[in-house]
Amino acid sequence: MSARTLFDKVWDAHTVKILPSGQTQLFIGLHLVHEVTSPQAFSMLRERGLKVLFPRRTIATVDHIVPTENQARPFLDDLAEEMIRAIETNVQTNHIPFYGIGSGNQGIVHVIAPEQGLTQPGMTIACGDSHTSTHGAFGAIAFGIGTSQVRDVLATQTLSLSKLKVRRVEVNGDLNPGVYAKDVILHIIRQLGVKGGVGYAYEYAGSTIERMSMEERMTICNMAIEGGARCGYINPDQITYDYLKGRDFAPKDWESAVNWWESIKSDADAVYDDVVVFDAGEIEPTVTWGITPGQGIGVNEVIPTPESLPASERAIAEEAYQYMKLTPGAPIKGTKIDVCFVGSCTNGRISDLREAAKFAQGHRVAPHVKAFIVPGSERVKKQAEAEGLDQIFLASGFEWREAGCSMCLAMNPDKLQGDQISASSSNRNFKGRQGSASGRTLLMSPAMVVAAAIKGEVTDPRELLN
């Protein structure tokens, strides 16, 4: 058999059949559901008299709309309470494992599945959420899906999908101090564009990626979708296996599992549809200035002028200048910040909070800034508190919250007001993304968010290191 990529091997292993349309009917090994995209799917099942085919292959939690301050039931928001009750009823009726608030396992769906060992190499994973690509960090093929597809997976445990091309995205060399996985992925999206990955799965590789921890790899794969790729993945290795070993759902026959995981790695002579290579040493602490994740620059660069951009990017740039109220040619560094948020499925894990605490320790949040830290899961919160990270944040003037999606999106009480501008460790800076029709979002690493909170403006985090 000819050399194949991991994507080819996993796709082939999960192919049920090729449909008359040319699409593949693909078996889904793990289905993750939350309170926002599942109620309609369960309703459609009931309307058709269908049942959940494999309840144990679905895992449910609540994350998008849960408040991160007052979690007393019933919630103050009637719609939020209604949606939480709906998923509680649906999982009970269909015998689906559920991690609710206070269970010790609740959290952002893309945080809790990896930390419990549910996400494993060689899996196909689906979830009604764009950032399901996160799970590709383990060598899984993971897709975000729509509500009708959530229904399909619940009813059949399969999806009808067109096979993607594969682009190998290599990053080689050593990262400079103060440069993180978030900077790497923002740099990649800046260079390849928000539509550059359409029709592709991205295989992230190279010496830089190979040295990353699993949580850093999850940050990389989380934002594959922001570059247009339906999924992104990294070949599993010893770092992957060390992370998974001993977790709740790790395979009992460990040796056999590792042997299989080794066999699905991309062959050394696999042929890719495209290959791009980046030099890690050229990546700077990166911040977005516009209204797409591709509108990013190094923290010491100036906001691009229309003349400096390709003709194809000028229209969206003009839209961004107007919305963001930023001046072309002006430095991004020094931009005043109103709200600072560390959290999300991109950067709400324990390693993110440890790094944030390192920058916060011994400093105080600027008087005009509202700053808060939101752990990605109840487990992350418990671990952070065991390490005393919460006390560092509180002493520095940050708010310490309960687990949830929080200010990543405008579905819970954590929202921008008016034309406030936020420094955010999340993954999207679209217009109105954080709750205000005129609110503005600058994406950056947790370290840079903390630096911005302390200085009250966009700051090179390396200044705090020094």
From Swiss-Prot:
Pathway: Amino-acid biosynthesis; L-leucine biosynthesis; L-leucine from 3-methyl-2-oxobutanoate: step 2/4. Keywords: 4Fe-4S, Amino-acid biosynthesis, Branched-chain amino acid biosynthesis, Iron, Iron-sulfur, Leucine biosynthesis, Lyase, Metal-binding. Its cofactor is [4Fe-4S] cluster. It is an enzyme of class 4 (lyase). It comes from the Bacteria. It holds the Pfam family Aconitase. One of its GO terms (biological process) is L-leucine biosynthetic process. GO terms for molecular function: 3-isopropylmalate dehydratase activity; 4 iron, 4 sulfur cluster binding; metal ion binding. [4Fe-4S] cluster binds at residues 345, 405, 408. Its EC number is 4.2.1.33. InterPro entries: 3-IsopropMal_deHydase_lsu, Acnase/IPM_dHydase_lsu_aba_1/3, Acoase/IPM_deHydtase_lsu_aba, Aconitase_4Fe-4S_BS, Aconitase_4Fe-4S_dom, IPM_dehydratase_rel_enz, IPMI_cat. The keyword 4Fe-4S applies. Binds 1 [4Fe-4S] cluster per subunit. It catalyses: (2R,3S)-3-isopropylmalate = (2S)-2-isopropylmalate. Heterodimer of LeuC and LeuD. Catalyzes the isomerization between 2-isopropylmalate and 3-isopropylmalate, via the formation of 2-isopropylmaleate. Belongs to the aconitase/IPM isomerase family. LeuC type 1 subfamily. This is 3-isopropylmalate dehydratase large subunit. The lineage of its organism: Bacteria, Bacillati, Cyanobacteriota, Cyanophyceae, Oscillatoriophycideae.
